Protein backbone atom coordinates (compact mmCIF):
# COMPACT_ATOMS: atom_id res chain seq x y z
CA UNK A 1 0.00 0.00 0.00
CA UNK A 2 1.45 3.33 -1.02
CA UNK A 3 1.36 6.43 1.11
CA UNK A 4 -1.25 7.87 -1.25
CA UNK A 5 -3.61 4.94 -0.61
CA UNK A 6 -3.20 5.52 3.07
CA UNK A 7 -4.45 9.09 2.79
CA UNK A 8 -7.33 8.06 0.56
CA UNK A 9 -8.57 5.64 3.20
CA UNK A 10 -8.40 8.15 6.02
CA UNK A 11 -10.42 10.71 4.10
CA UNK A 12 -13.39 9.54 2.12
CA UNK A 13 -13.75 5.79 2.55
CA UNK A 14 -12.88 5.29 6.17
CA UNK A 15 -15.32 3.34 8.28
CA UNK A 16 -15.58 6.33 10.62
CA UNK A 17 -16.85 8.45 7.71
CA UNK A 18 -19.37 5.76 6.81
CA UNK A 19 -20.48 5.60 10.46
CA UNK A 20 -21.00 9.35 10.59
CA UNK A 21 -23.03 9.44 7.38
CA UNK A 22 -25.23 6.55 8.49
CA UNK A 23 -25.81 8.16 11.89
CA UNK A 24 -26.66 11.57 10.43
CA UNK A 25 -29.36 10.06 8.22
CA UNK A 26 -30.75 7.83 10.96
CA UNK A 27 -30.79 10.46 13.69
CA UNK A 28 -32.50 13.02 11.43
CA UNK A 29 -35.15 10.43 10.58
CA UNK A 30 -35.74 9.44 14.19
CA UNK A 31 -35.90 13.04 15.38
CA UNK A 32 -38.71 13.73 12.93
CA UNK A 33 -40.85 11.29 14.92
CA UNK A 34 -39.79 12.69 18.25
CA UNK A 35 -41.90 15.81 18.00
CA UNK A 36 -45.07 13.99 17.07
CA UNK A 37 -47.86 14.34 19.59
CA UNK A 38 -48.22 11.24 21.72
CA UNK A 39 -51.96 10.98 21.02
CA UNK A 40 -51.46 10.07 17.33
CA UNK A 41 -51.80 6.28 17.64
CA UNK A 42 -54.93 6.63 19.80
CA UNK A 43 -56.39 9.19 17.39
CA UNK A 44 -55.77 6.84 14.50
CA UNK A 45 -57.46 3.97 16.33
CA UNK A 46 -60.54 5.98 17.31
CA UNK A 47 -60.93 7.53 13.86
CA UNK A 48 -60.84 4.05 12.37
CA UNK A 49 -63.56 2.88 14.78
CA UNK A 50 -65.82 5.79 13.79
CA UNK A 51 -65.29 5.26 10.08
CA UNK A 52 -65.89 1.55 10.40
CA UNK A 53 -69.33 2.30 11.81
CA UNK A 54 -70.31 3.69 8.42
CA UNK A 55 -67.97 2.20 5.86
CA UNK A 56 -66.43 -1.23 5.69
CA UNK A 57 -62.75 -0.28 5.60
CA UNK A 58 -59.66 -2.31 6.42
CA UNK A 59 -57.34 -1.69 9.38
CA UNK A 60 -54.67 -0.21 7.15
CA UNK A 61 -57.06 2.02 5.20
CA UNK A 62 -56.24 5.01 7.34
CA UNK A 63 -52.95 6.82 7.72
CA UNK A 64 -52.28 9.74 10.04
CA UNK A 65 -49.24 11.91 9.44
CA UNK A 66 -47.95 14.76 11.47
CA UNK A 67 -45.58 17.27 9.94
CA UNK A 68 -43.96 20.28 11.41
CA UNK A 69 -41.96 23.15 10.01
CA UNK A 70 -41.03 26.52 11.43
CA UNK A 71 -44.40 28.12 10.71
CA UNK A 72 -47.04 25.45 11.05
CA UNK A 73 -48.00 21.99 12.12
CA UNK A 74 -49.98 19.86 9.71
CA UNK A 75 -52.06 16.84 10.62
CA UNK A 76 -52.81 14.85 7.51
CA UNK A 77 -55.42 12.11 7.66
CA UNK A 78 -55.74 9.89 4.62
CA UNK A 79 -58.56 7.36 4.35
CA UNK A 80 -58.79 4.95 1.45
CA UNK A 81 -62.39 3.92 0.85
CA UNK A 82 -63.06 0.49 -0.59
CA UNK A 83 -64.19 0.18 -4.18
CA UNK A 84 -67.96 -0.02 -4.46
CA UNK A 85 -69.13 -3.57 -4.22
CA UNK A 86 -71.47 -4.49 -7.05
CA UNK B 1 -29.11 24.07 47.01
CA UNK B 2 -28.92 20.47 45.91
CA UNK B 3 -28.00 19.78 42.30
CA UNK B 4 -29.29 16.49 40.90
CA UNK B 5 -27.20 14.95 38.13
CA UNK B 6 -28.25 11.92 36.12
CA UNK B 7 -25.59 9.82 34.43
CA UNK B 8 -27.36 8.26 31.49
CA UNK B 9 -26.76 6.77 28.04
CA UNK B 10 -29.53 4.49 26.89
CA UNK B 11 -27.02 1.85 25.80
CA UNK B 12 -25.41 -0.47 28.33
CA UNK B 13 -21.72 -0.96 28.92
CA UNK B 14 -20.58 2.52 27.90
CA UNK B 15 -19.35 3.58 31.35
CA UNK B 16 -22.29 4.99 33.33
CA UNK B 17 -21.39 3.37 36.63
CA UNK B 18 -17.67 4.05 36.19
CA UNK B 19 -18.55 7.69 35.50
CA UNK B 20 -21.04 7.96 38.38
CA UNK B 21 -18.51 6.57 40.85
CA UNK B 22 -15.70 8.79 39.55
CA UNK B 23 -17.56 12.10 39.46
CA UNK B 24 -19.29 11.51 42.81
CA UNK B 25 -15.88 10.88 44.36
CA UNK B 26 -14.55 13.96 42.55
CA UNK B 27 -17.23 16.26 44.00
CA UNK B 28 -16.71 14.81 47.48
CA UNK B 29 -12.92 15.19 47.28
CA UNK B 30 -13.47 18.86 46.52
CA UNK B 31 -15.38 19.13 49.79
CA UNK B 32 -18.94 18.93 48.49
CA UNK B 33 -21.31 16.66 50.38
CA UNK B 34 -22.37 14.17 47.72
CA UNK B 35 -24.64 11.15 47.43
CA UNK B 36 -24.53 8.65 44.58
CA UNK B 37 -27.62 6.51 43.99
CA UNK B 38 -27.79 3.23 42.08
CA UNK B 39 -31.09 3.00 40.16
CA UNK B 40 -30.38 -0.40 38.62
CA UNK B 41 -32.73 -2.49 40.76
CA UNK B 42 -32.00 -6.19 40.28
CA UNK B 43 -28.57 -5.61 38.70
CA UNK B 44 -26.80 -3.37 41.18
CA UNK B 45 -23.11 -2.80 40.57
CA UNK B 46 -22.27 0.65 41.88
CA UNK B 47 -21.50 -0.93 45.28
CA UNK B 48 -18.82 -3.09 43.63
CA UNK B 49 -17.26 -0.20 41.70
CA UNK B 50 -17.23 1.88 44.90
CA UNK B 51 -15.81 -1.03 46.90
CA UNK B 52 -18.57 -1.07 49.52
CA UNK B 53 -20.40 -4.27 48.50
CA UNK B 54 -19.79 -5.94 51.86
CA UNK B 55 -21.25 -3.03 53.79
CA UNK B 56 -24.65 -3.03 52.08
CA UNK B 57 -27.39 -3.69 54.64
CA UNK B 58 -30.36 -1.71 53.37
CA UNK B 59 -31.08 -0.34 49.90
CA UNK B 60 -33.20 2.23 48.09
CA UNK B 61 -36.23 -0.08 47.91
CA UNK B 62 -36.11 -0.67 51.69
CA UNK B 63 -36.22 3.11 52.15
CA UNK B 64 -39.12 3.57 49.73
CA UNK B 65 -41.13 0.83 51.49
CA UNK B 66 -40.35 2.24 54.93
CA UNK B 67 -38.36 -0.84 55.95
CA UNK B 68 -35.32 1.31 56.74
CA UNK B 69 -34.58 4.99 57.18
CA UNK B 70 -32.48 6.84 54.64
CA UNK B 71 -29.74 7.23 57.26
CA UNK B 72 -29.62 3.46 57.75
CA UNK B 73 -29.35 2.80 54.03
CA UNK B 74 -26.72 5.43 53.15
CA UNK B 75 -23.19 3.99 53.20
CA UNK B 76 -20.42 6.39 54.04
CA UNK B 77 -17.48 5.99 51.65
CA UNK B 78 -14.28 4.68 53.20
CA UNK B 79 -12.02 7.03 51.20
CA UNK B 80 -13.93 10.26 51.57
CA UNK B 81 -16.22 11.24 54.40
CA UNK B 82 -18.22 13.67 52.26
CA UNK B 83 -19.42 10.83 50.03
CA UNK B 84 -22.40 8.53 50.61
CA UNK B 85 -23.69 5.64 48.52
CA UNK B 86 -27.32 4.52 48.29
CA UNK B 87 -27.31 1.04 46.75
CA UNK B 88 -30.02 -0.50 44.59
CA UNK B 89 -31.88 -3.59 45.66
CA UNK B 90 -30.54 -6.82 44.23
CA UNK B 91 -33.55 -9.00 44.99
CA UNK B 92 -36.61 -6.85 44.36
CA UNK B 93 -38.56 -6.48 41.17
CA UNK B 94 -37.40 -3.54 39.09
CA UNK B 95 -40.87 -2.00 39.36
CA UNK B 96 -40.42 -1.58 43.11
CA UNK B 97 -39.22 1.99 42.58
CA UNK B 98 -41.88 4.67 42.52
CA UNK B 99 -41.75 8.28 41.42
CA UNK B 100 -43.17 9.41 44.74
CA UNK B 101 -40.65 7.32 46.70
CA UNK B 102 -37.68 8.59 44.71
CA UNK B 103 -38.95 12.17 45.03
CA UNK B 104 -39.12 11.79 48.82
CA UNK B 105 -35.59 10.42 49.02
CA UNK B 106 -34.26 13.34 46.97
CA UNK B 107 -36.13 15.83 49.18
CA UNK B 108 -34.68 14.21 52.28
CA UNK B 109 -31.16 14.40 50.82
CA UNK B 110 -31.73 18.10 50.12
CA UNK B 111 -32.86 18.59 53.71
CA UNK B 112 -29.64 16.90 54.86
CA UNK B 113 -27.65 19.55 52.94
CA UNK B 114 -26.31 17.32 50.22
CA UNK B 115 -24.86 19.55 47.50
CA UNK B 116 -24.73 16.98 44.70
CA UNK B 117 -26.81 13.88 44.12
CA UNK B 118 -25.52 11.67 41.31
CA UNK B 119 -28.13 9.28 39.89
CA UNK B 120 -26.55 6.25 38.19
CA UNK B 121 -29.11 5.24 35.58
CA UNK B 122 -29.59 1.66 34.40
CA UNK B 123 -29.33 0.96 30.66
CA UNK B 124 -32.50 1.03 28.61
CA UNK B 125 -35.46 3.38 28.77
CA UNK B 126 -37.64 1.57 31.27
CA UNK B 127 -38.75 2.51 34.77
CA UNK B 128 -35.35 2.64 36.51
CA UNK B 129 -33.87 4.79 33.76
CA UNK B 130 -36.95 6.99 33.72
CA UNK B 131 -36.85 7.59 37.48
CA UNK B 132 -33.09 8.18 37.46
CA UNK B 133 -33.51 11.10 35.05
CA UNK B 134 -36.97 12.36 36.07
CA UNK B 135 -35.89 14.77 38.85
CA UNK B 136 -32.53 15.73 37.30
CA UNK B 137 -31.18 19.27 36.91
CA UNK B 138 -28.23 18.17 34.77
CA UNK B 139 -27.65 15.15 32.56
CA UNK B 140 -24.24 13.65 31.84
CA UNK B 141 -24.79 11.71 28.63
CA UNK B 142 -22.12 9.03 28.47
CA UNK B 143 -21.39 8.04 24.88
CA UNK B 144 -18.86 5.80 23.15
CA UNK B 145 -17.65 6.87 19.69
CA UNK B 146 -19.63 4.05 18.12
CA UNK B 147 -22.87 3.98 16.10
CA UNK B 148 -25.17 2.16 18.54
CA UNK B 149 -24.13 4.30 21.49
CA UNK B 150 -24.52 7.58 19.60
CA UNK B 151 -27.96 6.61 18.37
CA UNK B 152 -29.11 5.59 21.86
CA UNK B 153 -27.73 8.83 23.31
CA UNK B 154 -29.80 10.80 20.83
CA UNK B 155 -32.88 8.82 21.84
CA UNK B 156 -32.08 9.55 25.49
CA UNK B 157 -31.83 13.29 24.73
CA UNK B 158 -35.36 13.15 23.34
CA UNK B 159 -36.60 11.50 26.53
CA UNK B 160 -34.78 14.03 28.75
CA UNK B 161 -36.44 16.90 26.92
CA UNK B 162 -39.96 15.47 27.03
CA UNK B 163 -40.44 13.08 29.97
CA UNK B 164 -38.56 14.76 32.81
CA UNK B 165 -40.03 16.75 35.70
CA UNK B 166 -38.55 19.93 34.25
CA UNK B 167 -40.19 19.23 30.87
CA UNK B 168 -43.55 18.31 32.40
CA UNK B 169 -43.67 21.39 34.63
CA UNK B 170 -42.44 23.74 31.90
CA UNK B 171 -39.32 24.68 33.88
CA UNK B 172 -35.90 25.48 32.48
CA UNK B 173 -34.81 22.31 30.62
CA UNK B 174 -32.26 19.84 31.98
CA UNK B 175 -28.72 20.92 31.11
CA UNK B 176 -27.20 18.21 28.94
CA UNK B 177 -23.47 17.46 28.75
CA UNK B 178 -21.55 15.02 26.59
CA UNK B 179 -18.98 12.68 28.14
CA UNK B 180 -17.22 10.77 25.40
CA UNK B 181 -15.71 7.61 26.88
CA UNK B 182 -13.38 4.87 25.61
CA UNK B 183 -11.87 7.31 23.13
CA UNK B 184 -8.85 6.29 21.10
CA UNK B 185 -7.13 9.17 19.25
CA UNK B 186 -4.97 6.66 17.35
CA UNK B 187 -8.01 4.93 15.89
CA UNK B 188 -9.61 8.28 15.07
CA UNK B 189 -6.46 9.29 13.13
CA UNK B 190 -6.58 6.21 10.91
CA UNK B 191 -10.30 6.60 10.31
CA UNK B 192 -11.47 3.68 12.40
CA UNK B 193 -13.37 5.66 15.01
CA UNK B 194 -15.77 8.60 15.09
CA UNK B 195 -13.99 11.74 16.28
CA UNK B 196 -15.11 14.08 19.05
CA UNK B 197 -16.17 16.55 16.35
CA UNK B 198 -18.19 13.86 14.51
CA UNK B 199 -20.12 12.93 17.66
CA UNK B 200 -20.71 16.59 18.52
CA UNK B 201 -21.94 17.25 14.97
CA UNK B 202 -24.55 14.55 15.39
CA UNK B 203 -25.64 15.13 18.99
CA UNK B 204 -25.04 18.92 19.24
CA UNK B 205 -24.10 18.64 22.90
CA UNK B 206 -21.77 20.65 25.08
CA UNK B 207 -18.63 18.55 25.59
CA UNK B 208 -17.75 18.17 29.25
CA UNK B 209 -14.83 15.87 28.62
CA UNK B 210 -13.24 12.97 26.81
CA UNK B 211 -12.15 9.87 28.71
CA UNK B 212 -9.56 7.87 26.82
CA UNK B 213 -9.73 4.10 26.47
CA UNK B 214 -7.66 3.09 29.47
CA UNK B 215 -6.48 -0.02 31.24
CA UNK B 216 -6.86 1.82 34.53
CA UNK B 217 -10.69 1.61 34.36
CA UNK B 218 -10.58 -2.18 34.65
CA UNK B 219 -7.86 -2.25 37.29
CA UNK B 220 -9.74 0.34 39.36
CA UNK B 221 -12.92 -1.75 39.22
CA UNK B 222 -10.94 -4.88 40.12
CA UNK B 223 -10.05 -3.33 43.44
CA UNK B 224 -13.26 -1.35 44.05
CA UNK B 225 -11.67 2.09 43.79
CA UNK B 226 -13.33 4.77 41.66
CA UNK B 227 -10.83 5.41 38.85
CA UNK B 228 -10.53 9.10 39.76
CA UNK B 229 -8.53 7.99 42.83
CA UNK B 230 -5.86 6.65 40.45
CA UNK B 231 -4.39 10.10 39.96
CA UNK B 232 -1.58 8.87 37.75
CA UNK B 233 -3.90 7.27 35.23
CA UNK B 234 -5.17 9.08 32.11
CA UNK B 235 -8.78 8.11 32.82
CA UNK B 236 -8.47 9.30 36.43
CA UNK B 237 -7.10 12.64 35.26
CA UNK B 238 -9.80 12.92 32.60
CA UNK B 239 -12.51 12.50 35.25
CA UNK B 240 -10.78 15.00 37.55
CA UNK B 241 -10.82 17.50 34.65
CA UNK B 242 -14.52 16.83 34.07
CA UNK B 243 -15.38 17.45 37.73
CA UNK B 244 -13.39 20.69 37.79
CA UNK B 245 -14.87 21.84 34.49
CA UNK B 246 -18.41 21.13 35.68
CA UNK B 247 -17.70 23.11 38.86
CA UNK B 248 -16.75 26.09 36.70
CA UNK B 249 -12.98 25.88 36.33
CA UNK B 250 -11.64 26.73 32.90
CA UNK B 251 -9.60 23.67 31.97
CA UNK B 252 -8.50 22.90 28.40
CA UNK B 253 -9.54 19.56 26.96
CA UNK B 254 -6.99 16.76 27.03
CA UNK B 255 -6.87 13.21 25.66
CA UNK B 256 -8.35 14.26 22.30
CA UNK B 257 -4.98 14.27 20.54
CA UNK B 258 -2.55 11.38 20.39
CA UNK B 259 0.22 11.23 22.92
CA UNK B 260 3.42 12.31 21.25
CA UNK B 261 5.88 9.49 20.73
CA UNK B 262 9.62 9.86 21.07
CA UNK B 263 9.84 11.43 17.60
CA UNK B 264 7.04 13.83 18.38
CA UNK B 265 8.88 14.94 21.48
CA UNK B 266 12.02 15.70 19.52
CA UNK B 267 10.53 16.99 16.30
CA UNK B 268 6.97 17.93 17.32
CA UNK B 269 5.68 21.14 15.84
CA UNK B 270 3.61 22.17 18.84
Question: What would you call each of these model-derived segments?
Answer:
Chain B
Residues 111-112, 116, 122-208:
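Conserved catalytic-core segment of NTP-binding enzymes
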Residues 4-68, 116:
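Walker A/P-loop NTP-binding active-site region of P-loop NTPases
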Residues 9, 38, 87-90, 121, ...:
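Flexible glycine-/small-residue-rich
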Residues 167-270:
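C-terminal lobe/tail of nucleotide-utilizing enzymes
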Residues 39-111, 221-222:
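P-loop/Walker-type NTP enzyme "switch/lid" segment
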Residues 12, 63, 86, 120, ...:
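Residue-level signature of catalytic and energy-coupling elements of molecular machines
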Residues 57, 71, 99, 103, ...:
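Amphipathic alpha-helical transducer elements in NTP-driven molecular machines
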Residues 25, 107, 130-131:
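Alpha-helical segments flanking ligand/cofactor-binding loops in enzyme cores
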